Amino acid sequence: HDPGAIGVNKTHEADVVLAIGKELNELLKGYDLEVKFTRLSDVYLSLSERAKIANDFKADYFLSIHINSATDSSVRGVEVWQYSNKNDKLNKFSNGLCEDVANIFNARNRGVKQSQKLSVLKNTNMPAALIEVDFISNVNAERDLNVSSNIKAVALVIRDNLIDLFGLEAVASDVLYKVCIGAFKDKNNAINQ
């Protein structure tokens, strides 16, 4: 078990990204997408194993979800890493994702960056992005990353940017609306209720 980065209050990166992944898995149901998660349980996979899963699956795109950490505990912000900026669709996806996630946390959009050194970007055969969802080393970011509505919001913007990337139609959410209807003979009774 590799906890990944660990916050001041002992929040584990692995737990946060697993929660985002599980939420995203639910949100993607009902779309015309074949999705493969490298993990939906607390099982450790090496970076090379993750790349191999994506390559064996022959994925069109690969997204790796992470939480950043820095020695300077004041640092906050969201960034997305790509191997190169040669794929316009991936660039649009990464820029949108970076902006949308930064807005959730009211954190700095640190932008889309390139690296040929990150294992999952270097070893995947498809366009790949790695998102760093804020800095767990910042106590306020760590707190925000423990709020379930923020986890849901991150999963939702990942879903929405994936939908946009593939040009898919949004499906109606399976929200159950409850309606209470009152019938009144006298309008004043309705107003006074």
What is each model feature region?
Residues V171-Q193:
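Solvent-exposed beta-strand motifs enriched in subsets of small alpha/beta binding domains
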Residues H1-A51, F57, E169:
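Active-site histidine-acidic residue metal-binding/catalytic motifs
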Residues K22-L33, N55-A59, C98-N106, N150, ...:
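Sec-exported extracytoplasmic/periplasmic mature domains
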